[in-house]
Amino acid sequence: MSLSSLLPTPTNAIWDREDERRLVARGAPKIGALVSAKIAAPPYGQRKDWVPHTDADFGDGGAFPEIHVAQYPLGLGAPGNVGKKSDALAVRLDDKGKVKYDAIARQGHGKDKIVYSSISQLLPAEVLAEDADELQRPDEETVMETTEETRLALEKLTNQKITSALPVRHAQKAGPAQYIRYTPSQQGDTFNSGAKQRVIRMVEAQLDPMEPPKFRINKKIPRGPPSPPAPVLHSPSRKVTVKEQKEWKIPPCISNWKNAKGYTIPLDKRLAADGRGLQQVHINEKFAKMAEALYIADRKAREAVEARSQLEKKLAQKEKEKKEDMLRMMAQRAREERAGLRNPEAAEPSGSGATGSEVRERNDLRAERQRERQRDRNLQRAAPEKRSKLQKERERDISEQIALGLPAKSAGNGETLFDQRLFNTTKGMDSGYGDDEAYNVYDKPWRDSNTLGAHIYRPSKQADSDNYGGDLDAIVNTKRFVPDKQFSGASKEAAAGQRSGPVEFEKEEDPFGLDQFLNMAKKAPKRAEEKNNERSSHSDRKRSKRD
């Protein structure tokens, strides 16, 4: 015996919301029907025990107010749809029952935003209101009034321009007098002479035509705002193709000088941003003319510089030759003075025997030779470094007959002499190559012992052997530097002949003019004394004449 058997049968159906949700979550089994069934709500008055569960139970309408159960037609207000947002727009109808599609254009804009959704909204009000009074043609009277007002306004503007340009303006005509009734606020016998009202005559003040303007009238007035731009009607949006995207792609602005963030920019992007490939390169023909003119100017300038340098070299060479001549003369004089030579005019006639002066000269010459031999021995005993330095500083004898790198000249006819070793030899390329094992580069001496240089400083047989002693080998083995040209002023006959000794120079008495300067300085006080004596004698003469 159960409890349900004891209880009476329930009159209402049992419905539990939680059980219903579980069934919906599980999903009711789908049973295919052979005949389509149309689900509809029961008719009105028979819905006592019926509860809508699906969207199909509501049909196209809303909730059922007579059923006291929470209802969510089309899912509106359902607990699961509270936080969700939908882009669906509610369908609205206009006064004629047509769907208002302007809601699509207004979507996403504020309520105060003006959105033109039809062509009629873009037309001005004059076009829409064709029957308005403002658009009607005016009558003849209105046309005449407007014409007269326009004429007067234009005349006024023209007269103002003319009068402002004139240096002297005419006096303006005074306007008519105006009469104004004035009622004072303070009434009484003590005010306004007991009068309650007054009549005031208002007259325009007279203006001075010669008075300059008081205010600045040429101030520039800013322009008013322009008319609003015309609206642009856009075509419906369509998907942009890849080609259009590439055409609309604008390269970024890349600076050639600044890169604050240190980005690594490829060269093709730099060239695209530079835009050099978009413009056609055109080289002006005057660039070639300018380059040619610059080349000609540069060539002429180089020629001028070369000519100047050649001239300077010639002048420097002449100056050098002049100084060398002067040095040769000074050396000649010094050698003559050192050797004690005298001019034949100043020499006294010598007797048959040797005088004391000649003996003294020979002794001096022997002493000088002895000093030179002592110096050579000291050089040979000196250290190698010091010896090379002293040998460089040795006094060099100069000969005008020996020139380095130049052929010698014969004494008779002046023909050029060549090295005889070069003649009658078959040592060219056609004679074949030498033996590889032989080393005959220095098999022969470069200079022959029978040349002029070997005998030019050789003492003659008539010279005194005591003067030279054992200096012959030293003189032969000594290398001398020779000039490449003759001395200026030397005769060819003397140059061609053989010389028995080195070149001797005459010493100049006063090369820098110091003796002459000292003599002038010494004579200056004497001249001053002579002038003073002359002045004193002249003054004495004048005094004697006066006396």
Swiss-Prot record:
GO MF annotation list: DNA binding
SNW, as annotated region: 177-343
Ranges of biased composition (kind: Basic and acidic residues): 358-398, 526-539
Chief localisation class: nucleus
Record-linked InterPro entries: SKI-int_prot_SKIP, SKI-int_prot_SKIP_SNW-dom
Region (Disordered): 333-398, 486-547
Phosphoserine modified-residue sites: S227, S235
Subcellular locations according to the entry: Nucleus
Keywords from the named record: DNA-binding, Nucleus, Phosphoprotein
One annotated Gene Ontology cellular component of this protein: Prp19 complex
One GO process term, biological-process aspect: eye-antennal disc development
Protein task: May play a role in chromatin structure and function.
Family recorded in the similarity comment: Belongs to the SNW family.
This protein's name: Puff-specific protein Bx42
Classification of source organism: Eukaryota, Metazoa, Ecdysozoa, Arthropoda, Hexapoda
Gene symbol of the encoding locus: Bx42
